[in-house]
Amino acid sequence: FLLNGMHIKMNGVCLHHDAGCLGSAVPEHAWARRLQLLKEMGCNAIRTSHNPPAPEFLDLCDKMGFLVMDEIFDEWVEKKGQVGFGYHIYFEEWWKSDLLSMIHRDRNHPSVVIWSAGNEVPDQVVETGSEVMRKLAETFHKEDPTRPVTQANDRIAAGDGPAILPFLQLQDIVGYNYVDRWNERRELYYSVDRH
């Protein structure tokens, strides 16, 4: 990652919006403590899994010098698993309003360096998924042309089927999850020592 002309290796974690047993209404001092502990262990980057974070969280990331991947959706049009009451029910009606709200709220945070359109959405392997990814990426780029767009992909081991490759090509940064699932394709895409 290039930051102010310097190459920076991102060493990060995924953080959900809650603080475990403290729940979702997290006191700012709890986030400050958690972020300080992460910084002490060498962490400099955070992915906000899988929903937009609280503004106070991003304020702390700005102050403490973290790089943030700001993520919005955990589900698009296709539902995950057997759950029948997820965001997929509302996606077509609400995606644009929700996305614009997040971008407009978060785009002035210097800590936000990457936008993430989603987490392991089933849409990545269906023909219609590329069109959804295109709409999301275009909206991100229109509202904020300064940051790259990604999506957490977990179906890489499925191969370059008719749906996955066009889906991946719409992302500025292709994020790969679960390297251990890739089997013989692992070395094509990933190496701990590769820069």
Each predicted region: which residue ranges?
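Substrate-binding/catalytic cleft of secreted carbohydrate-active enzymes
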Residues: 32-41, 45-195
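N-terminal carbohydrate-binding accessory modules
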Residues: 1-40, 59
